Amino acid sequence: PRTTLVALENTHNAAGGVPLTPEDMKSVADVAHGYEIPVHVDGARLFNASVALETPAAELVKDVDTVTFCLSKGLGAPVGSLLCGSNEFVHEARRWRKMLGSAMRQSGVIAAAGIVALETMVDRLAEDHSNARRLATGLAEVPGIAIDPEAMPTNLVFFTLKYSNHDEIA
């Protein structure tokens, strides 16, 4: 089958939370667009990438066609995500949403929480990253845990248990 979409995630949990740079994003987008294939970014942790790279989120996604990002993951809003793209794309997405019956009534209060998250919580992600490194540093002191705190640039902490049998540590 022919590829119809290239999807990226920034940051990606399987990559240890290491952010894709603007150059990485552009390289992928250039190849995909050369084949007339659109590029979508799952930006659930896009703002974490932005903070870690000290690069505006808009700069990270300027070469892609569409992006979604979550207002609750990391930013602290109770719910909500945004779908961003060209005016034509957003118009079509709204049409599909209405055809499929998806809607939320009286969502102004929840939308207000999303706006507060965007306006005030992005800067606090640096604290989240610092706390993750602090946790990783503490875990590195625990016998039986293998972890490299320096290899964690964002808020995701990964470690390996050195023991394969829990009886060995009991």
Segments and roles (model prediction):
Residues P1-P149, T154-A170:
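Conserved PLP-enzyme active-site core in the AAT-like
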